[in-house]
Protein backbone atom coordinates (compact mmCIF):
# COMPACT_ATOMS: atom_id res chain seq x y z
CA UNK A 1 0.00 0.00 0.00
CA UNK A 2 1.31 3.44 -0.97
CA UNK A 3 0.84 6.02 1.80
CA UNK A 4 0.30 9.77 1.24
CA UNK A 5 3.42 11.91 1.50
CA UNK A 6 4.09 12.91 5.14
CA UNK A 7 5.43 16.41 5.69
CA UNK A 8 8.19 14.98 7.87
CA UNK A 9 9.60 11.49 8.39
CA UNK A 10 9.52 12.11 12.16
CA UNK A 11 6.89 14.17 13.98
CA UNK A 12 7.03 14.74 17.75
CA UNK A 13 9.56 11.90 18.14
CA UNK A 14 7.33 9.43 16.26
CA UNK A 15 8.66 8.00 13.00
CA UNK A 16 6.41 7.09 10.07
CA UNK A 17 6.96 3.78 8.27
CA UNK A 18 5.76 2.56 4.89
CA UNK A 19 5.95 3.30 1.18
CA UNK A 20 5.16 6.92 0.35
CA UNK A 21 3.79 8.64 -2.75
CA UNK A 22 6.81 10.93 -2.65
CA UNK A 23 9.66 11.98 -0.39
CA UNK A 24 8.70 13.65 2.91
CA UNK A 25 9.67 17.31 2.83
CA UNK A 26 11.93 16.76 5.84
CA UNK A 27 13.93 13.54 6.38
CA UNK A 28 15.96 13.59 9.60
CA UNK A 29 15.91 10.19 11.35
CA UNK A 30 17.65 11.67 14.41
CA UNK A 31 14.51 13.65 15.31
CA UNK A 32 13.06 10.43 16.77
CA UNK A 33 15.57 10.73 19.64
CA UNK A 34 16.69 13.35 22.13
CA UNK A 35 19.66 14.15 24.34
CA UNK A 36 22.41 11.59 24.77
CA UNK A 37 20.50 8.92 22.85
CA UNK A 38 20.38 11.20 19.81
CA UNK A 39 24.14 11.81 19.98
CA UNK A 40 24.84 8.09 20.26
CA UNK A 41 22.46 7.27 17.42
CA UNK A 42 24.24 9.79 15.21
CA UNK A 43 27.30 7.53 15.24
CA UNK A 44 25.17 4.73 13.72
CA UNK A 45 23.48 6.93 11.11
CA UNK A 46 24.83 6.45 7.58
CA UNK A 47 23.74 8.97 4.95
CA UNK A 48 24.56 9.11 1.28
CA UNK A 49 23.25 10.59 -1.94
CA UNK A 50 24.52 9.16 -5.19
CA UNK A 51 23.70 8.64 -8.85
CA UNK A 52 24.14 5.81 -11.34
CA UNK A 53 24.48 7.25 -14.84
CA UNK A 54 22.97 5.40 -17.82
CA UNK A 55 24.68 6.17 -21.16
CA UNK A 56 25.52 3.84 -24.09
CA UNK A 57 29.26 4.66 -24.11
CA UNK A 58 29.87 5.20 -20.39
CA UNK A 59 29.40 3.44 -17.07
CA UNK A 60 29.63 5.80 -14.11
CA UNK A 61 28.53 6.12 -10.49
CA UNK A 62 29.16 8.97 -8.04
CA UNK A 63 28.33 9.46 -4.38
CA UNK A 64 28.61 11.80 -1.40
CA UNK A 65 28.45 9.90 1.91
CA UNK A 66 28.64 10.78 5.59
CA UNK A 67 29.12 8.16 8.32
CA UNK A 68 29.43 11.03 10.86
CA UNK A 69 32.80 9.81 12.11
CA UNK A 70 34.12 9.94 8.51
CA UNK A 71 32.84 11.41 5.26
CA UNK A 72 33.86 10.64 1.70
CA UNK A 73 33.03 10.99 -1.96
CA UNK A 74 33.81 8.72 -4.90
CA UNK A 75 33.31 8.69 -8.65
CA UNK A 76 34.29 6.19 -11.31
CA UNK A 77 33.94 6.20 -15.08
CA UNK A 78 34.40 3.34 -17.53
CA UNK A 79 34.79 4.26 -21.19
CA UNK A 80 33.25 1.31 -23.07
CA UNK A 81 34.97 2.16 -26.35
CA UNK A 82 38.45 2.41 -24.85
CA UNK A 83 37.95 -0.10 -22.05
CA UNK A 84 39.39 2.38 -19.51
CA UNK A 85 38.30 2.53 -15.85
CA UNK A 86 39.19 5.67 -13.88
CA UNK A 87 38.43 6.41 -10.23
CA UNK A 88 38.68 9.42 -7.93
CA UNK A 89 38.03 9.32 -4.17
CA UNK A 90 38.32 11.79 -1.32
CA UNK A 91 37.93 11.61 2.48
CA UNK A 92 36.87 14.36 4.87
CA UNK A 93 35.83 14.98 8.45
CA UNK A 94 32.50 13.43 9.42
CA UNK A 95 29.68 15.95 9.20
CA UNK A 96 31.51 18.15 6.70
CA UNK A 97 29.46 17.37 3.54
CA UNK A 98 26.22 19.25 3.08
CA UNK A 99 23.39 16.69 2.91
CA UNK A 100 20.34 18.72 3.98
CA UNK A 101 17.23 16.94 5.29
CA UNK A 102 15.13 19.07 2.91
CA UNK A 103 16.37 17.67 -0.41
CA UNK A 104 14.32 19.68 -2.87
CA UNK A 105 15.27 23.33 -3.07
CA UNK A 106 18.65 22.52 -1.47
CA UNK A 107 22.25 21.81 -2.46
CA UNK A 108 24.31 18.75 -1.52
CA UNK A 109 27.98 19.68 -1.53
CA UNK A 110 31.29 17.88 -1.08
CA UNK A 111 34.37 20.02 -1.58
CA UNK A 112 38.05 19.44 -0.95
CA UNK A 113 41.14 20.83 -2.70
CA UNK A 114 40.99 19.53 -6.26
CA UNK A 115 37.66 17.76 -5.73
CA UNK A 116 34.19 19.29 -5.89
CA UNK A 117 30.87 17.53 -6.37
CA UNK A 118 27.58 19.45 -6.12
CA UNK A 119 23.95 18.37 -6.51
CA UNK A 120 21.58 21.33 -6.84
CA UNK A 121 17.97 20.19 -6.44
CA UNK A 122 15.12 22.37 -7.65
CA UNK A 123 11.45 21.77 -6.89
CA UNK A 124 10.55 18.07 -6.77
CA UNK A 125 9.31 18.03 -10.37
CA UNK A 126 11.61 20.82 -11.49
CA UNK A 127 15.18 20.79 -12.78
CA UNK A 128 18.09 19.35 -10.80
CA UNK A 129 21.80 19.64 -11.60
CA UNK A 130 24.92 17.58 -11.01
CA UNK A 131 28.20 19.50 -11.25
CA UNK A 132 31.65 17.98 -10.90
CA UNK A 133 35.11 19.54 -11.01
CA UNK A 134 37.85 17.07 -10.14
CA UNK A 135 41.55 17.60 -10.82
CA UNK A 136 43.76 14.96 -12.41
CA UNK A 137 45.63 12.57 -10.11
CA UNK A 138 48.51 10.18 -10.72
CA UNK A 139 46.05 7.42 -11.60
CA UNK A 140 43.14 9.21 -13.28
CA UNK A 141 42.57 12.19 -15.59
CA UNK A 142 40.58 15.26 -14.64
CA UNK A 143 36.79 14.98 -14.69
CA UNK A 144 34.53 17.95 -15.32
CA UNK A 145 30.91 18.31 -16.30
CA UNK A 146 27.34 19.31 -15.62
CA UNK A 147 24.15 17.35 -16.08
CA UNK A 148 20.61 18.74 -15.98
CA UNK A 149 17.97 16.30 -14.72
CA UNK A 150 14.26 16.50 -15.59
CA UNK A 151 12.37 16.06 -12.31
CA UNK A 152 9.06 15.54 -14.11
CA UNK A 153 10.28 13.26 -16.87
CA UNK A 154 10.54 9.90 -15.13
CA UNK A 155 8.38 7.43 -13.20
CA UNK A 156 7.10 8.14 -9.68
CA UNK A 157 9.73 7.79 -6.95
CA UNK A 158 10.51 4.89 -4.68
CA UNK A 159 10.24 6.33 -1.16
CA UNK A 160 10.41 3.81 1.69
CA UNK A 161 10.78 3.93 5.48
CA UNK A 162 11.36 0.43 6.93
CA UNK A 163 12.29 -1.38 10.11
CA UNK A 164 15.37 -3.52 9.51
CA UNK A 165 16.89 -6.01 11.98
CA UNK A 166 19.76 -3.62 12.77
CA UNK A 167 17.80 -0.36 12.73
CA UNK A 168 15.40 1.74 10.64
CA UNK A 169 16.12 2.55 6.99
CA UNK A 170 14.91 5.36 4.74
CA UNK A 171 15.59 5.58 1.02
CA UNK A 172 14.43 7.74 -1.86
CA UNK A 173 15.18 6.65 -5.43
CA UNK A 174 14.12 8.05 -8.78
CA UNK A 175 14.87 7.91 -12.51
CA UNK A 176 15.65 11.22 -14.24
CA UNK A 177 16.20 11.89 -17.96
CA UNK A 178 19.62 13.58 -18.18
CA UNK A 179 21.01 16.29 -20.46
CA UNK A 180 24.55 17.74 -20.53
CA UNK A 181 28.06 16.39 -20.75
CA UNK A 182 30.89 14.89 -18.73
CA UNK A 183 34.52 15.19 -19.80
CA UNK A 184 37.04 12.56 -18.68
CA UNK A 185 40.50 13.62 -19.79
CA UNK A 186 40.23 14.20 -23.55
CA UNK A 187 36.96 12.24 -23.91
CA UNK A 188 33.54 13.91 -23.76
CA UNK A 189 30.28 12.06 -23.15
CA UNK A 190 27.15 13.95 -24.22
CA UNK A 191 23.88 13.03 -22.50
CA UNK A 192 20.60 13.08 -24.44
CA UNK A 193 17.40 13.12 -22.28
CA UNK A 194 15.57 11.08 -24.93
CA UNK A 195 18.07 8.26 -24.33
CA UNK A 196 20.07 8.74 -21.12
CA UNK A 197 19.20 8.62 -17.42
CA UNK A 198 20.50 9.34 -13.94
CA UNK A 199 19.25 7.07 -11.13
CA UNK A 200 19.11 8.89 -7.78
CA UNK A 201 19.88 6.91 -4.60
CA UNK A 202 19.36 8.73 -1.29
CA UNK A 203 19.84 6.75 1.94
CA UNK A 204 19.52 7.81 5.58
CA UNK A 205 19.70 4.64 7.65
CA UNK A 206 20.84 3.25 10.99
CA UNK A 207 22.93 0.38 9.71
CA UNK A 208 23.96 -2.44 12.07
CA UNK A 209 27.63 -2.79 12.98
CA UNK A 210 27.87 -5.88 10.79
CA UNK A 211 26.21 -5.04 7.49
CA UNK A 212 25.70 -7.15 4.39
CA UNK A 213 23.64 -6.58 1.28
CA UNK A 214 23.37 -7.50 -2.39
CA UNK A 215 21.83 -4.77 -4.54
CA UNK A 216 21.18 -4.06 -8.18
CA UNK A 217 19.56 -1.45 -10.36
CA UNK A 218 19.06 -0.78 -14.07
CA UNK A 219 16.99 1.41 -16.35
CA UNK A 220 16.49 2.44 -19.96
CA UNK A 221 14.08 4.53 -22.00
CA UNK A 222 11.83 2.25 -24.01
CA UNK A 223 8.91 2.88 -26.33
CA UNK A 224 6.66 3.56 -23.31
CA UNK A 225 9.16 5.81 -21.54
CA UNK A 226 11.60 4.99 -18.73
CA UNK A 227 11.51 1.42 -17.40
CA UNK A 228 13.77 -0.06 -14.72
CA UNK A 229 14.10 -1.81 -11.40
CA UNK A 230 15.77 -1.53 -8.01
CA UNK A 231 16.21 -4.67 -5.91
CA UNK A 232 18.01 -5.81 -2.78
CA UNK A 233 18.66 -8.82 -0.57
CA UNK A 234 19.83 -8.22 3.01
CA UNK A 235 21.08 -10.53 5.71
CA UNK A 236 18.25 -11.05 8.20
CA UNK A 237 15.47 -9.78 5.95
CA UNK A 238 13.08 -7.00 6.95
CA UNK A 239 9.82 -6.80 8.89
CA UNK A 240 8.54 -3.92 6.74
CA UNK A 241 8.43 -3.28 2.97
CA UNK A 242 11.88 -3.26 1.42
CA UNK A 243 13.38 -0.94 -1.20
CA UNK A 244 12.78 -3.21 -4.20
CA UNK A 245 10.54 -2.00 -7.03
CA UNK A 246 9.74 -2.09 -10.73
CA UNK A 247 9.62 1.32 -12.40
CA UNK A 248 7.27 2.00 -15.29
CA UNK A 249 6.13 5.31 -16.70
CA UNK A 250 3.23 5.53 -14.24
CA UNK A 251 4.32 3.62 -11.14
CA UNK A 252 7.01 2.38 -8.79
CA UNK A 253 5.51 -1.05 -8.16
CA UNK A 254 6.63 -2.88 -4.98
CA UNK A 255 8.79 -5.94 -5.47
CA UNK A 256 9.68 -8.40 -2.70
CA UNK A 257 11.70 -11.54 -1.99
CA UNK A 258 14.53 -11.10 -4.51
CA UNK A 259 17.35 -13.65 -4.85
CA UNK A 260 20.87 -13.17 -6.24
CA UNK A 261 23.04 -16.01 -7.59
CA UNK A 262 26.47 -15.69 -9.23
CA UNK A 263 27.07 -18.31 -11.91
CA UNK A 264 30.65 -18.89 -10.73
CA UNK A 265 33.18 -17.59 -8.19
CA UNK A 266 35.00 -15.50 -10.81
CA UNK A 267 35.28 -11.73 -10.24
CA UNK A 268 33.36 -10.99 -13.46
CA UNK A 269 30.93 -13.89 -13.29
CA UNK A 270 27.41 -13.30 -14.62
CA UNK A 271 24.66 -13.13 -11.97
CA UNK A 272 21.03 -14.16 -12.05
CA UNK A 273 18.48 -12.13 -10.08
CA UNK A 274 14.84 -13.12 -9.70
CA UNK A 275 11.83 -12.44 -7.51
CA UNK A 276 9.81 -15.24 -5.93
CA UNK A 277 6.70 -14.18 -7.87
CA UNK A 278 8.55 -14.17 -11.22
CA UNK A 279 7.98 -10.47 -11.95
CA UNK A 280 11.75 -9.93 -12.08
CA UNK A 281 13.91 -12.50 -13.89
CA UNK A 282 17.18 -11.20 -15.29
CA UNK A 283 20.79 -12.16 -15.96
CA UNK A 284 23.49 -9.56 -15.40
CA UNK A 285 26.68 -9.72 -17.48
CA UNK A 286 29.46 -7.52 -16.05
CA UNK A 287 31.73 -5.45 -18.27
CA UNK A 288 33.92 -4.35 -15.36
CA UNK A 289 34.30 -4.06 -11.61
CA UNK A 290 35.17 -1.49 -8.95
CA UNK A 291 36.55 -2.80 -5.62
CA UNK A 292 36.87 -1.02 -2.26
CA UNK A 293 38.67 -2.65 0.68
CA UNK A 294 39.52 -0.96 3.98
CA UNK A 295 40.69 -2.61 7.20
CA UNK A 296 40.79 -0.50 10.37
CA UNK A 297 40.85 -1.50 14.03
CA UNK A 298 37.09 -1.64 14.57
CA UNK A 299 35.80 -1.00 11.06
CA UNK A 300 36.24 -2.80 7.76
CA UNK A 301 34.73 -2.66 4.28
CA UNK A 302 34.87 -5.33 1.58
CA UNK A 303 32.79 -3.97 -1.29
CA UNK A 304 32.51 -4.34 -5.01
CA UNK A 305 30.28 -2.85 -7.67
CA UNK A 306 29.94 -4.52 -11.05
CA UNK A 307 28.79 -2.50 -14.05
CA UNK A 308 27.33 -4.13 -17.13
CA UNK A 309 24.21 -5.27 -18.98
CA UNK A 310 20.90 -6.85 -17.90
CA UNK A 311 18.89 -9.23 -20.07
CA UNK A 312 15.58 -10.87 -19.16
CA UNK A 313 12.04 -9.82 -18.27
CA UNK A 314 10.15 -7.43 -16.01
CA UNK A 315 6.45 -8.06 -15.51
CA UNK A 316 4.64 -4.90 -14.44
CA UNK A 317 0.93 -4.41 -13.85
CA UNK A 318 0.63 -3.14 -17.43
CA UNK A 319 2.64 -5.70 -19.39
CA UNK A 320 5.80 -7.78 -19.63
CA UNK A 321 8.92 -5.85 -20.62
CA UNK A 322 11.68 -7.68 -22.49
CA UNK A 323 15.19 -6.47 -21.64
CA UNK A 324 18.23 -6.86 -23.88
CA UNK A 325 21.56 -5.37 -22.83
CA UNK A 326 20.08 -2.75 -20.49
CA UNK A 327 22.81 -0.92 -18.58
CA UNK A 328 23.00 -1.09 -14.80
CA UNK A 329 25.03 -2.14 -11.77
CA UNK A 330 25.16 -4.90 -9.15
CA UNK A 331 27.00 -4.60 -5.85
CA UNK A 332 27.93 -6.55 -2.73
CA UNK A 333 28.69 -4.90 0.63
CA UNK A 334 30.29 -6.71 3.57
CA UNK A 335 31.16 -4.29 6.35
CA UNK A 336 31.76 -3.57 9.99
CA UNK A 337 30.80 0.09 10.32
Model-inferred region functions:
Residues 1-337:
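Structured soluble/peripheral alpha/beta segments that form catalytic or ligand/cofactor-binding pockets
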Amino acid sequence: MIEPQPSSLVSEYVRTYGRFESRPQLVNPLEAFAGMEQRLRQLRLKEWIGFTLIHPELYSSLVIQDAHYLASSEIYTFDRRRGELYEHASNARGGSPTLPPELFGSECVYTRPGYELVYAFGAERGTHRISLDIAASRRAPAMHGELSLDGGGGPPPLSVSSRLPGGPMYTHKRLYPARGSIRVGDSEFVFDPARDLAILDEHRSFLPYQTRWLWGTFAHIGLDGPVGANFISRAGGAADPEESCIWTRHAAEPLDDVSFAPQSAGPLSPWRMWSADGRLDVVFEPDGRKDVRHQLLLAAIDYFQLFGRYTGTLRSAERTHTLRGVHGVCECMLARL
